[in-house]
Amino acid sequence: MPNPLQAPSQALALESFLPYRLSVLAQVVSQALHDLYAGPFDLAVTEWRVMAALGRFAPLTASEVGQRIVMDKVAVSRAVARLLKRGLVERTADRADRRRAPLKLSARGRGVHARIVPLALEYEARLYTALNEQERRQFDALSDRLFIHAQVLRQNR
């Protein structure tokens, strides 16, 4: 087993290292999208992701939101607290299990969500103009494969 404290036998070409490239791409895309909604709606990236998940899958508990958006519990909890305070999200009662506290968008939250979704979809469409239709299908298929394989690798570590 290699010693992680020893000098590496080869240099890491960061600019071609897949995890780095994916992270940078995600950050650039996320920041560009954030620039569209941050000012008008005063939302952080995490807050919008929580709202997007609830807009699509509600009701969800905070833990379920975290699983859907692949984000740690602390970040989700903070975002949920801010959204609750602003009246964009509300807790619902789970009659079957009183320990559960599912979340959903409030009427105000649904209004904000409805105004951001077209901006997000328009940005996605502009981003995809860099690819032709075949490349887009390939990108989607390859992204799905890498996502599934990364999950398998993480479970098998």
Please give the residue ranges for each predicted region.
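N-terminal leader segment of winged-helix/HTH proteins
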Residues: 1-41
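Charged, amphipathic alpha-helical coiled-coil/dimerization segments
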Residues: 3-5, 81-144
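N-terminal helix-turn-helix DNA-binding core of bacterial DNA-binding proteins
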Residues: 13, 31-74, 155-157
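Active-site phosphate/pyrophosphate-handling residues
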Residues: 17, 49, 74, 126, ...
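Alpha-helical linker/hinge and terminal dimerization helices associated
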Residues: 29, 33-36, 69, 112-131, ...
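A secondary-structure capping/hinge motif
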Residues: 41-42, 85, 147
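Short amphipathic alpha-helical elements of helix-turn-helix/winged-helix folds
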Residues: 53-57, 142, 149
